[in-house]
């Protein structure tokens, strides 16, 4: 097995160690391997390929980190065909929350989420993806 080196803030490392201890992992490497497999598998779900999807992406960042807000604005414009709606809110005193509602293909949503994940200084990124056609019956009710 290859050995890799990963840089992360001390606080995240402490959380990783605590998580490993609390959940019975043998160490950091096992946690990172499982997290990596889960991350890579998130958008490899064959049931979603070729279907129209909707997604919600939530990003939280420190309000003083203006580079993140600028990046979010840039991504919103760069992916205007994908972003159906966008909402910005101030939360918790020192934080901003950016919420994106997306509608598009698995590939386009994957690309968008990947670009957000690559944005430096975000605190949390959360998302969910659902097929639009699963709600077709609800839309037909008169």
From Swiss-Prot:
It comes from the Archaea. Its cofactor is Ni(2+). CDD domains: RHH_NikR_HicB-like. InterPro entries: Acetolactate_synth/TF_NikR_C, ACT-like_dom_sf, Arc_rbn_hlx_hlx, CopG, CopG/NikR_regulator, Ni_resp_reg_NikR, Ribbon_hlx_hlx, TF_NikR_Ni-bd_C. Keywords: DNA-binding, Metal-binding, Nickel, Transcription, Transcription regulation. GO terms for biological process: regulation of DNA-templated transcription; response to nickel cation. One of its GO terms (molecular function) is nickel cation binding. Pfam families: NikR_C (PF08753), RHH_1 (PF01402). Gene3D superfamilies: ACT-like. Chain A, domain 2, Met repressor-like. Binds 1 nickel ion per subunit. Coiled coil: none annotated. Ni(2+) binds at residues 77, 88, 90, 96. Homotetramer. Transcriptional regulator. Belongs to the transcriptional regulatory CopG/NikR family. This is Putative nickel-responsive regulator. It comes from Halobacterium salinarum (strain ATCC 700922 / JCM 11081 / NRC-1).
């Amino acid at each position: 097995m290859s050995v890799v080196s990963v840089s992360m803030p001390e606080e995240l490392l402490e959380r990783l160690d605590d998580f490993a201890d609390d959940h019975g992992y043998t160490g950091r490497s096992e946690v990172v391997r499982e997290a990596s497999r889960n991350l890579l598998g998130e958008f490899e779900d064959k049931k979603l390929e070729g279907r129209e999807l909707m997604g919600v992406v939530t990003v939280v960042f420190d309000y003083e980190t203006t580079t993140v807000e600028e990046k979010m604005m840039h991504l919103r414009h760069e992916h205007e065909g994908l972003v159906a709606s966008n909402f910005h809110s101030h939360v918790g005193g020192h934080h901003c929350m950016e919420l994106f509602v997306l509608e598009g293909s698995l590939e386009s949503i994957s690309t968008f989420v990947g670009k957000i994940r690559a944005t430096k200084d975000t605190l949390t990124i959360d998302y969910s993806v659902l097929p639009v056609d699963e709600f077709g019956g609800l839309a037909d009710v008169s």
